[in-house]
Each structure stands twice: as structure tokens, then as C-alpha cells.
Amino acid sequence: MALTILKAENHRRMPWKNGGGVTVEIAVHPQGASVDDFDWRVSMATVASDGPFSVFPGIDRTLSVLEGDGILLDVEGEETKLTRESAPLAFAADARSSARLIGSAITDLNVMTRRGRLAHNVRRLPVDGTTLTVADGNPALLFCSEGQLDLNSGSEAVRLEKLDCAVFAGGNAEPLTIRGKGTAFLISIVAI
């Protein structure tokens, strides 16, 4: 398994596509792709005010709240409350969508894939001193949103600090053992 660690201090900052804020790009494929030509992309953003989401034609998106009180997300007139405890929410990134803050600003995690080429799945994994074992044959990313996590793939052992991300480029055919105290998001990318 090919394992790459993306350290938080190296994540790339750039303006939102709609100019309304700043996004922190964690990972993108192909490497160096722009917001218009990526196959998949994982990023974070701080939402400090109510407003529309950027439109990404032909893209599917999953949104998770990492910090803050949450948002009321309106996608094509259907409103969903998203908080740190909510399951990640999948929706079309080309759908008309906007957010209203429930309280203070939030930080969110965005996972996006090009529809018709790839699909993705996002799972929140709380780790509280226990050991979790994840086995999945698809390319995957493990994003540490809180705490410190020790990963062991059988052939490699690494530590993720808050906001670090591990990329398993060749898929995770070996079981991945996660130890520590914190929260991770397991992101699987699947070719269609």
C-alpha cells in the first residue's frame, strides 16, 4: 500500500470559487488540478456568514461540520440541519445550495468527485482510546479532524496530528488499525 502523509501546515489556501471566502485544499487529484478540472478534491472551509455555496457543474459533494454550532443547509429548497454530530451529507454540487449559520462560524470538510467518473463515501470515525480496524480495497484518505491518531497498516506506522491527512493511493487492501483519541473521517474514492 502506498501511504502519503499530508501535513496540515502544507495544505494550500485559495479563494472560494464564488469569491465569498477561503478554502484550505487538503488533497486533490490529479495533483495540481484547479477547481475546474479535478477528478476528486478534499478541502476545508470556514463559513463565517450566511450565503450561497459555490456551484461545481458535474460534481458530487459531501459536507461535514468540523467546528462550530452548525448550519442549516438548503439544497434546492430542502433544508437540513448539519452539526458536528450529524452524519456527513451528500448532495449534487451543481444544485442551488446555501447555508445559514445556527450560531457562530463553522469549519466544514468538503469531499467532491467528478460525477460519471468517480463516486465517494465519507464516514466519521470517533476514536476514544480504542482500536478501530478498517479494511477497504478502494483508494482512501483518512483525515484527522481532532486529537492525535496512530495508524498501523501492517507495513507502516504513522501518527496523524489534528488536520493531517493520510492518503492510501494504492487502496487499503491491508487492514488499517487506528489508535488514539480523536475523530477521523474515512474517505473512500471509487471509480465508476
Language-model-detected regions and their locations in the chain:
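Jelly-roll (double-stranded beta-helix
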Residues: 1-192
